Amino acid sequence: MKNGKLYLKVALGYLLVLLFALMLLTSCSADSGQNEESGRRIIVDQLGRAVELPETIEKVCATHIYGGKMLFAMGQIEKIAFQMQIGADTEAVAVVDEHYGSLPTVLSSPQGTDSPEGLLALGVNLVFTDVSKGEEATEMYQNAGIAAIAVSGETFEEVYETARMMGEVFECPERADEVISFIEDLRNMISSRLAGLPGEERPVVLVCGSGGVYTAATAGMFQHHMVETAGGINAGAQLSGRWANISAEDIILWDPDFIVLGSTFGVDDVDSVLAESALKTVKAVKNKEVHIFPSSLGWWDFPLPQSVLGIIWTAKTIHPDYFEDVDMLEMADRVYEFIYGYTYTELGGVL
């Protein structure tokens, strides 16, 4: 009799466990079915916001240069709503690419492109915004009915995160992997050549912004990582914020081996820096090691997919013996073709 009661208790126990497991399975299946049935897709952007994606992504754009260039790198030119004003490289694409060249421009768009209303008029239902502008700027589009995803690319990890995110948004994860692998292969080429480089052979490099020689790249900027990857030491490594204002005394104190001007659109050029009397004792000026990024088609020192070229060029500039065989025009052709579908040369670029 005791054995019978024991058997009954064990059987009831198993039954309860089985029923509980079935309840869990049913609950999970119901939740999953609801999501599939509603077609809802949620993505967390680089501000940590949960964004519900449109059921069908019709037209897209970006409010800043980085986001726009990433759309090209991810192969989404067919979904871009208008010719974004994001640099000479994409202006060149508009000349050679029939589809992109046929899109509305900022001037031809009836309501412009700098407001949610203007984007809605162009059929945009997804926009990529700049993390640095904060949540309020992004929510402005969200509140107008446009799904808004904030992205940032100040580090390689952030660039890769953006690529994976866009891969999920546009359902092309394989392209995200290609973008990441492409950049990583070039970074590894640089690091393998500089492996074992002694600390004393790492020159101090001052990277200046479009504001001129008295603006410096800080530790929180892409340019800092660019210099470090290229085998240098960022002169502004102790600074914070973005493009910190500096003085002649700061530059004299740092005494950089190289000064790199970030853009041909800046207020200074090589000759004006070499002629700056306040900097005549600085090593880079005395040795005429003042340089400017050579691209005529878009920036190589901003957080952009093609900025891997800026790293290669910087490495070749400050460590010429390690990169003597690297042809920058050939490298530019390769990178631009990967991103835009056209070589640097085909787009009319010169170095």
Regions from the language model: what does each represent?
Residues 62-120, 126-131:
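A short, structured surface patch at a secondary-structure boundary
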Residues 216-242:
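Alpha-helical, coiled-coil/dimerization segments enriched in small aliphatic residues
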Residues 46-48, 103-117, 154, 239-248:
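Short helix-initiation/N-cap motifs at beta->coil->alpha
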Residues 113-123, 144, 246-255:
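Short helices/loops that flank or line small-molecule/ion binding pockets
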Residues 29-31:
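Bacterial signal peptide processing site
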Residues 24-27:
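C-terminal motif of bacterial Sec signal peptides marking the signal peptidase cleavage site
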Residues 43, 50, 136-215, 236-238, ...:
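Extracytoplasmic substrate-binding proteins
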Residues 2-15:
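Bacterial N-terminal signal peptides that target proteins for export
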